[in-house]
Design a protein with these regions (language model features):
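N-terminal secretory signal peptides and thylakoid transit peptides that target proteins
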Residues: 1-25
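A residue-level marker of the well-folded mature domains of exported/periplasmic proteins
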Residues: 27-317
C-alpha cells in the first residue's frame, strides 16, 4: 500500500489556489464514495464503507455510496454524484484515478478524491500510504519466520500499489535472511477461488509464508494458508482477529483515519488539489497490527526498531 512519496505535502501554486478558493461549508457537506467491491469483503471496500460511515458520525456530513462498480462504469458513477450536487466525490481505489481525471474538469465545483491515488491538481486530491515501509516490515518478519527460505507474495494487478508492496516485501525478506520470493498476480481483486489457487500454487513450490494483497480474494489465500499450515500476513485491518492461527502480522492501511483527515480539511475549506501521503508517522491512518505470539520477542523488537528508523528517516525502503 508504499512509496517513497511526499510526506504530508509540498504545496504547489495550483494546489494553494484550489485550497484558498474553497470556503468552509456552512451546512452539512454532501459526500459520496464509489467503491469497486463488496462492502462486506473484510478488506479494501469494507474499509471505505466504514470510513464514510465514521465520517458521517463524527463530522455530521450527508453521505451516499455505490459498491461493486466495475472500472468501465467508474467515471459515470462519479459524474452522476457530481450532477446531483455532492460536494465531494471519492473514488475508492487507485484505479479511479483515470475516472476522476476524465470528469473533474466538467464539474469544477465538486472536489474529487482518489483513495490510494497518486495524483492531484485543480479539483482532484488523492490519499495514499507509504506502502514500501509496510512491505519491507512484513517481508522482514517473513524472512525471520521461514523454514524453507521461500516466501510468497500475491497481488491483484500490476499497479503502483502492488509493485511497491512486492518489491519492498522482497527487500525486507532478503534483509532478514530469506532467499526467494515467489510472485503471482490473480488479475482479479475479489475472486476468492483465484486467491486460494494462487496461494496453493506457491505453497506447492515451497513457500511457507505468504502475503496476499488483493481485496476480497485475500480470503481465499488465507484459507489456503490455514489449511496447509503455513503463515500469512493481513492487510488493511488487524487480521489476526479472524485468523489467529495463520496471520503473523498485518499492514494496517486504515483509510478510515485518512478519510476523516481529508474530509475535515474539506469542511474547513482547506482540502488541496494534491496527494496526501500517510505513513508510520501518522498512526491514525497507517500502523502495524498485532504480532502473533509465535513471532519471537527478539524478532518483534527488531521490527519495531526498524519501524522507528523509518519514522526518523534513517531507513527508507
Amino acid at each position: 500500500m508504499i512509496m517513497s512519496k511526499r510526506s504530508f505535502l509540498t504545496l504547489s501554486g495550483a494546489a494553494l489556489a484550489f485550497a484558498v478558493a474553497r470556503p468552509a461549508w456552512a451546512q452539512a457537506m454532501k459526500v459520496a464514495i464509489v467503491m469497486p467491491g463488496n462492502i462486506t469483503d473484510k478488506s479494501w471496500t469494507q474499509s471505505g464503507y466504514e470510513g464514510i460511515l465514521q465520517a458521517k458520525e463524527k463530522l455530521g456530513i450527508e453521505i451516499a455510496y455505490s459498491e461493486k462498480v466495475v472500472q468501465a462504469d467508474q467515471a459515470e458513477a462519479m459524474a452522476d454524484y457530481a450532477r446531483r450536487g455532492y460536494n465531494v466525490v471519492i473514488g475508492h481505489g487507485g484505479e479511479f484515478q483515470d475516472a476522476a481525471s476524465r470528469v473533474a474538469s466538467r464539474y469544477p465545483d465538486t472536489l474529487f478524491v482518489v483513495n490510494n491515488g497518486q495524483e492531484g491538481g485543480d479539483n482532484i486530491a488523492s490519499a495514499d500510504f507509504n506502502f514500501r515501509q509496510f512491505g519491507y516490515l512484513m517481508g522482514y518478519v517473513a524472512g525471520k519466520m521461514t523454514k524453507t527460505g521461500k516466501a510468497g507474495w500475491i497481488g491483484g494487478q500490476k499497479i503502483k500499489f502492488s509493485l511497491d508492496l512486492n518489491s519492498s516485501y522482497e527487500e525486507g525478506f532478503k534483509a532478514a535472511g530469506g532467499q526467494e520470493v515467489l510472485t503471482a498476480y490473480t488479475n482479479d481483486w475479489d475472486d476468492i477461488a483465484k486467491g486460494k489457487e494462487a496461494a496453493l500454487n506457491q505453497i506447492s513450490q515451497g513457500a511457507d509464508v505468504i502475503f496476499p494483497t488483493m481485496d476480497n480474494a485475500v480470503i481465499g489465500s488465507l484459507q489456503a494458508c490455514k489449511e496447509k499450515g503455513v503463515w500469512a500476513f493481513g492487510l488493511y485491518y488487524d487480521a489476526i482477529v479472524d485468523w489467529p492461527e495463520t496471520v503473523l502480522q498485518s499492514a494496517i492501511f486504515d483509510i478510515k483515519g485518512a478519510m476523516l483527515t481529508y474530509l475535515q480539511l474539506a469542511i474547513d475549506g482547506k482540502l488541496e488539489g494534491k496527494n496526501y501521503n500517510f505513513d508510520l508517522s501518522t498512526p491514525e491512518a497507517a500502523r502495524l497490527g498485532t504480532f502473533n505470539p509465535a513471532v519471537p520477542k527478539e524478532v518483534q523488537d527488531e521490527v519495531l526498531a526498524l519501524a522507528e528508523k523509518m519514522k526518523s528517516g534513517e531507513l527508507k525502503p
